[in-house]
């Protein structure tokens, strides 16, 4: 399977936001499908659960699919997917999630939480990445403490022998902390800064990295 897995240092670091940019870039050169195999904290609208992150991914894509295809497992509880599924008596397994990720085109899969967040019964996001065997994009909120968060995520990925496509420092608010320079002293991973005021630099860097991933 060809694709990317979007993970990060935790929740609310901008995974979906960065994923949309990567998807929009990739749609310029190939057909892209998206998958959010499981999503918690879905809104209940007239008895139907609405996965907001999966909807955003779908809008960035150039292939129209049903939201149930994009996000197979939806939970209303604001908790980990593992806890949310168990609360409903559903034994969600790694095989279930792998099956929910399958696509016949290049696929961008967004996980839930960080690499070591539980996502199914005795299953972490890292287990899912291993199973579908695609490069991982690590999204880190670029703030004080980002160096530690980035290195923890990179070390976790390396421990599980995952292929790191890039680490994206998401500057939700532009800053001069210099985290990119600090992180590069401790890793050979590709470090890219997302800054709304310098999108061209971000696009140039991701183009080089993603094109290299595509020809592997």
From Swiss-Prot:
E.C. code: 6.3.3.3
This protein's pathway: Cofactor biosynthesis; biotin biosynthesis; biotin from 7,8-diaminononanoate: step 1/2
Enzyme class: ligase
The entry's keywords: ATP-binding, Biotin biosynthesis, Cytoplasm, Ligase, Magnesium, Metal-binding, Nucleotide-binding
Residues annotated as binding ATP: 12-17, 53, 110-113, 170-171
Single Gene Ontology BP annotation: biotin biosynthetic process
Keyword match Heme: no
Binding-site positions, substrate: 40
Active site positions, chain numbering: 36
Location of the protein in the cell: Cytoplasm
Signal peptide: none
A single cellular component GO annotation: cytosol
Keyword Lyase listed: no
Gene3D superfamilies, per database record: P-loop containing nucleotide triphosphate hydrolases
Entry cofactors: Mg(2+)
InterPro entries assigned to the protein according to its UniProt record, in alphabetical order: DTB_synth_BioD, P-loop_NTPase
Residue positions binding Mg(2+): 16, 53, 110
Molecular-function annotations in GO: ATP binding; dethiobiotin synthase activity; magnesium ion binding
Catalytic activity: (7R,8S)-7,8-diammoniononanoate + CO2 + ATP = (4R,5S)-dethiobiotin + ADP + phosphate + 3 H(+)
Complex and partners: Homodimer.
Job description of the protein: Catalyzes a mechanistically unusual reaction, the ATP-dependent insertion of CO2 between the N7 and N8 nitrogen atoms of 7,8-diaminopelargonic acid (DAPA, also called 7,8-diammoniononanoate) to form a ureido ring.
HAMAP family membership: BioD
Protein name: ATP-dependent dethiobiotin synthetase BioD
């Amino acid at each position: 399977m060809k694709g990317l897995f979007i993970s990060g240092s935790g929740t609310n670091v901008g995974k979906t936001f960065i994923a949309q940019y990567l998807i929009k870039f990739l749609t310029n050169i190939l057909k892209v499908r998206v998958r959010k195999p499981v999503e918690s904290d879905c809104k209940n609208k007239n008895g139907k659960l609405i996965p907001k992150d999966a909807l955003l991914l779908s809008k960035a894509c150039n292939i129209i699919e049903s939201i149930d295809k994009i996000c197979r497992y939806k939970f209303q509880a604001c908790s980990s997917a593992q806890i949310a599924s168990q609360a409903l008596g559903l034994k969600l397994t790694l095989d279930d999630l792998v099956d929910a990720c399958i696509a016949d085109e290049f696929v961008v899969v967004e996980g839930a939480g960080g690499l070591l967040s539980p996502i199914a019964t005795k299953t972490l996001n890292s287990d899912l990445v291993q199973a579908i065997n695609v490069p991982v994009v690590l999204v880190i909120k670029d703030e004080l403490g980002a160096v530690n968060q980035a290195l923890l995520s990179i070390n976790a990925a390396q421990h599980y022998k995952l292929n790191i496509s890039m680490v994206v420092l998401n500057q939700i608010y532009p800053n001069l902390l210099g985290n990119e320079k600090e992180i590069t002293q401790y890793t050979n991973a590709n470090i890219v800064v997302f800054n709304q005021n310098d999108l061209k630099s971000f696009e140039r860097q991701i183009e080089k990295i993603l094109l290299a991933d595509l020809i592997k």
